Amino acid sequence: RGFWLLVMGFYVCGFQIQFINNHLENYLDGTIVGGAMAATAIALIGLFNMFGTQTAGVIGDKLRKKYLLANLYMARSVIFLIFFIVPVSKVSVIIFACSVGFLWLATVPLTSGIVAQIFGPRYLATLYGVVFLSHQLGSFTSVWLGGIIRTQTGSYDYAWYMIIVAGFVAALLHWPIDEQPIVRPVAAS
């Protein structure tokens, strides 16, 4: 059960980050800062991602990964919500990009760490591949739905609501995950 909760949570990771990656420019183009500011934002996201991912890996060695993931998804949604309700300016875009960048792929060492911790290194590649597939499906879904929402309504408002709510749902999904390693019987000689 915990594995499938992790799969669903990582779906949300892809769902959130690819919406930003693919629709931020168009979203900002409709504001006073213009779409060109999105290039700066994506660059800052990439820069802060390096530090956030490294930090998550280090902290994940010391604290329970499932709780770190739950808090990470919740923090992302809070950042998205604040960015969505605060008037857009160059300063708000820079603060948003740095904040969300720090959390951008910080999910990866924690998610792969849970898979390794539960199933062991022998099954890590295959099982993390399944988890990563869900990330890609989430990516596709948010990019596609974001485009449909923008086309149908002329606004990204409902898409922002979607990624915000999805993050809170992902936070809840991680709480019941059992991180204990699976005990396998030792084969007799």
Named regions from a protein language model:
Residues 115-124, 154:
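Paired intracellular helix-loop junctions of major facilitator superfamily
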Residues 3, 65, 121-125:
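Cytoplasm-facing, short amphipathic helices at loop-to-helix transitions on the intracellular side
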Residues 35-36, 121-130:
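Loop-to-transmembrane helix entry/capping segments in MFS-fold secondary transporters
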Residues 164-189:
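Multi-pass alpha-helical transporter architecture, strongest
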Residues 28-29, 59-60, 145-154:
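Interfacial helix-cap and linker-helix signal at transmembrane-aqueous boundaries
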Residues 19, 43-49, 53-114:
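C-terminal transmembrane helical hairpin of 12-TM major facilitator-type secondary transporters
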Residues 12, 44, 48, 75, ...:
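Small/hydrophobic positions within alpha-helical transmembrane segments
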Residues 1-58, 108, 142:
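Extracytoplasmic gate region of multi-pass secondary transporters
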